[in-house]
């Protein structure tokens, strides 16, 4: 019996309890990809994309979790962060499970980015990042459960924490901060 209390495990359990057979990593990747491509942070548009990925109507508890996930992503992308937090299994999970989730995250990111970006021209640097993500999405079975495999996983994960910011800067540009209520 797993005692993993990570956000990934909690989100995974929530999805499973609602009959959804999707990885939290893939959902997070899709959200981050669409956001980085300039889709914006409008909740209903994100929920519609998530419903398509999840195969239909979203139960309220999953809906609330998806809204929370979007708020987290919006804060990371617009708050001057130097890296994003990836929704992946904890370090205690077997390397094969973490590598598979990393691949799912990349697949979700590419799907979300592609839907939102359309045929927009991209810089050579942005194209290279997308090509890297496509290559990483295929890596899950290539990592061996060893110190070397662990090191390669960590290196790829660190790259993925900063790569989305390049794409966001190029495609989405600056987002106006939410208006603060005036105090009278």
Curated annotation (Swiss-Prot):
GO terms for cellular component: cytosol. Pfam families: UPF0149. Coiled coil: none annotated. InterPro entries: YgfB-like, YgfB-like_sf. NCBIfam families: PRK02166.1. Belongs to the UPF0149 family. This is UPF0149 protein Avin_47340. It comes from Azotobacter vinelandii (strain DJ / ATCC BAA-1303).
């Amino acid at each position: 019996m797993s005692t993993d209390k990570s956000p990934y495990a909690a989100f995974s359990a929530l999805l499973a309890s609602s009959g959804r057979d999707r990885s939290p990593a893939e959902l997070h990747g899709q959200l981050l990809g669409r956001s980085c491509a300039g889709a914006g942070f409008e909740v209903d548009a994100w929920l519609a994309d998530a419903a398509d990925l999840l195969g239909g109507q979203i139960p309220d508890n999953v809906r609330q979790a998806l809204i929370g996930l979007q708020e987290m992503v919006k804060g990371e992308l617009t708050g001057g962060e130097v890296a994003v937090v990836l929704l992946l299994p904890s370090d205690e999970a077997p390397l094969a499970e973490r590598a598979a989730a990393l691949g799912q995250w990349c697949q979700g990111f590419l799907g979300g980015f592609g839907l939102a970006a359309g045929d927009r021209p991209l810089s050579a640097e942005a194209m290279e990042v997308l090509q890297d993500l496509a290559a990483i999405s295929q890596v899950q079975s290539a990592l061996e459960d060893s110190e070397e495999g662990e090191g390669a996983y960590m290196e790829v994960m660190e790259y993925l924490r900063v790569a989305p910011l390049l794409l966001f800067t190029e495609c989405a540009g600056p987002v106006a901060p939410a208006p603060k209520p005036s105090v009278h």
